[in-house]
């Protein structure tokens, strides 16, 4: 599963995955970003422009809002089924 970052937005914004799924975040933007869960259950750390980061979805099902900690207007939801 992959989430892309471009033009200061996540694509897709909302994503549904299985528990423990591996998710790759590709930063296709011209500046650094993060993808960080509101409850801190996952966090890519800073992803520089043109780079990627991978994380595991939580083991517990539910909805996990996330945002970029550098640009908090960027947000979405990871749903674990």
What are these regions (language model features)?
Residues 1-81:
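Extracytoplasmic copper-binding redox domains, predominantly the cupredoxin/blue-copper superfamily
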């Amino acid at each position: 599963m992959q989430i892309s970052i471009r033009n200061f937005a996540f694509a897709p914004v909302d994503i549904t995955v299985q528990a423990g799924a591996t998710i790759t975040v590709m930063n296709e933007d011209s500046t650094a970003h993060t993808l960080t869960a509101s409850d801190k259950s996952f966090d890519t750390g800073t992803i520089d422009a043109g780079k990627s980061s991978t994380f595991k979805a939580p083991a517990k099902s539910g909805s996990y809002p996330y945002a970029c900690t550098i640009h908090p207007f960027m947000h979405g939801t990871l749903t674990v089924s």
